[in-house]
């Protein structure tokens, strides 16, 4: 018997249920550079102290179970357990607390977002002692980051591939999202790209349905891309959605896209799953394909303020798993997104190093070391009048995506694309000349519309369209 085993055996085993806080609440713990740190918004059940609730989260998401077990004596719990090391009340909320938990790195498989989430946001979210639980943020240590490939290419490589610099990229989701034949779909793609857009996009639920099988769509879209490139002299792309029912089918679609020579494919990373997404990201890097990521299903997870997981965590997970673009909200359009919160996770997607900033919802300083950045995509209910605000909010390293705001133009798809391109170029020029886009935006668009009948028509159509609802998820 080894000395270590003798020591553990001599302690003895006492069956029964213990308070979690006796083992997992460690306020004196000093976090390590290699720890994964998590900030949970905890709402305990009545009568459950916050220390016990925070310790329960640490236990149930690491080594703990509901009772003492004799096999605890066969390992070093002190080495492997999660620790709740700090608890603070949430300002303005009754019986809500932020519980900070540190996890030792050895709890997680290298290069696996799937395994990381299975532990941290697994069974613990159904724990009866908690009325609600939300993961607000994660600090991923550099030692763990270095086990991931991350985005297939990143922002700079994408710009070099496209030969487009100094402005946001322009996109459009083809509408109606379902029901078009492959040929009519390809026609809409061609008209939008010819009109001046950089990208067009499959909607998230376009996969391979009876009205339009994936192979037919890929072929007609490739034809549209090459025709538009020949006529405009610009590199164009269409986000061909490779999402499928199996990983094998997904990769088959990506292989066909590569054989067609198109620059980019797409994946629904939450409905498709992180294992599938990471596999596709590896294929895309190895084969020179950019990867656009749609976040369909995110609001099921992140929209409620007291339960689920904040999108900033999903954004960090996507950067680890791999994607060159990801939808991030618009601040000004029809979909959820408060400005400071949105800009907080936009920086987490793009920048190499992000300081802790609670005013933007960032709970931890995050160093991404050499992991490439991800372009945020603003999409959903936006049109030409939003262009100055979008340019000012998101800056050059972004994709501005107008679906209805392109295809809803009264003169057709190509004029809709022209209107958006003229509006963007006018905003970029005005910004470069030192004008204030936030204050002078409408005037800049009106001036540009004098020289572009397409833009003037778009301005008239959408002059009264607004989406003025308060965001559900706001800063505390």
From Swiss-Prot:
Entry keyword set: Acetylation, Calvin cycle, Carbon dioxide fixation, Chloroplast, Disulfide bond, Lyase, Magnesium, Metal-binding, Methylation, Monooxygenase, Oxidoreductase, Photorespiration, Photosynthesis, Plastid
Cofactor note: Binds 1 Mg(2+) ion per subunit.
Sites annotated Transition state stabilizer: 334
Principal location: plastid
Active site (UniProt): 175 (proton acceptor), 294 (proton acceptor)
PTM characteristics: The disulfide bond which can form in the large chain dimeric partners within the hexadecamer appears to be associated with oxidative stress and protein turnover.
Pfam families: RuBisCO_large, RuBisCO_large_N
Binding-site residues for substrate, renumbered to this chain: 123, 173, 177, 295, 327, 379
Family: Belongs to the RuBisCO large chain family. Type I subfamily.
PANTHER family linked: RIBULOSE BISPHOSPHATE CARBOXYLASE (PTHR42704), RIBULOSE BISPHOSPHATE CARBOXYLASE LARGE CHAIN (PTHR42704:SF15)
Protein name: Ribulose bisphosphate carboxylase large chain
Source organism of this protein record: Phaseolus vulgaris
Origin organism lineage: Eukaryota, Viridiplantae, Streptophyta, Embryophyta, Tracheophyta
């Amino acid at each position: 018997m080894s000395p270590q085993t003798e020591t553990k055996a001599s302690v003895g085993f006492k069956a029964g249920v213990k308070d979690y806080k006796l083992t997992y609440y460690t306020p004196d713990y000093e976090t390590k550079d290699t720890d994964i740190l998590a900030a949970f918004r905890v709402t305990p059940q009545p009568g459950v102290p916050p220390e016990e609730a925070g310790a329960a989260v640490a236990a149930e998401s690491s080594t703990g179970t509901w009772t003492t077990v004799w096999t605890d004596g066969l390992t070093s719990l002190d080495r492997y357990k999660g620790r709740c090391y700090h608890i603070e009340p949430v300002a303005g909320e009754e019986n809500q607390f932020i519980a900070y938990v540190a996890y030792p790195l050895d709890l997680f498989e290298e290069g696996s977002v799937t395994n990381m989430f299975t532990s941290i946001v697994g069974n613990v979210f159904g724990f009866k002692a908690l009325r609600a639980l939300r993961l607000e943020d994660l600090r991923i240590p550099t030692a763990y980051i270095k086990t991931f490939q991350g985005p297939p290419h990143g922002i700079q490589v994408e710009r070099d591939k496209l030969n487009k610099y100094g402005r946001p990229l322009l996109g459009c989701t083809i509408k109606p999202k379902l029901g078009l034949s492959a040929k009519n779909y390809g026609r809409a793609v061609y008209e939008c790209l010819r009109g001046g857009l950089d990208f067009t996009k499959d909607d998230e639920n376009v996969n391979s349905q009876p009205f339009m099988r994936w192979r037919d769509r890929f072929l007609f879209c490739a034809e549209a891309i090459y025709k538009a490139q020949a006529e405009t002299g610009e590199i164009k792309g269409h986000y061909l959605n490779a999402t499928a029912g199996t990983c094998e089918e997904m990769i088959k679609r990506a292989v066909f896209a590569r054989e067609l020579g198109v620059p980019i494919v797409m994946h629904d990373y939450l409905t498709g799953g992180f294992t599938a997404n990471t596999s596709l990201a590896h294929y895309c890097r190895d084969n020179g394909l950019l990867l656009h990521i749609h976040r369909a299903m995110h609001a099921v997870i992140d929209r409620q303020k007291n339960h689920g997981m904040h999108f900033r965590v999903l954004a960090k997970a996507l950067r680890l798993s791999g994607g060159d673009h990801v939808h991030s909200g618009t601040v000004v359009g029809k979909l959820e997104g408060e400005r400071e919160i949105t800009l907080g996770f936009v920086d987490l997607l793009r920048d190499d190093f992000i300081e802790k900033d609670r005013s933007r919802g960032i709970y931890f300083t995050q160093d991404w070391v050499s992991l490439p950045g991800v372009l945020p995509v603003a999409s959903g209910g936006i049109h030409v009048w939003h262009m100055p605000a979008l340019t000012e909010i998101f800056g050059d390293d972004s994709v501005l995506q107008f679906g209805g705001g392109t295809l809803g133009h009264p003169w057709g798809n190509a004029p809709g694309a022209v209107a958006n391109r003229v509006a963007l170029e006018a905003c970029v020029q005005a910004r470069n000349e030192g004008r204030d886009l936030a204050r002078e935006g409408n005037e800049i668009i009106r001036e540009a519309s004098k020289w572009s009948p397409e833009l003037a028509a778009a301005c008239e159509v959408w002059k009264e369209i607004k989406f003025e609802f308060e965001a559900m998820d706001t800063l505390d």
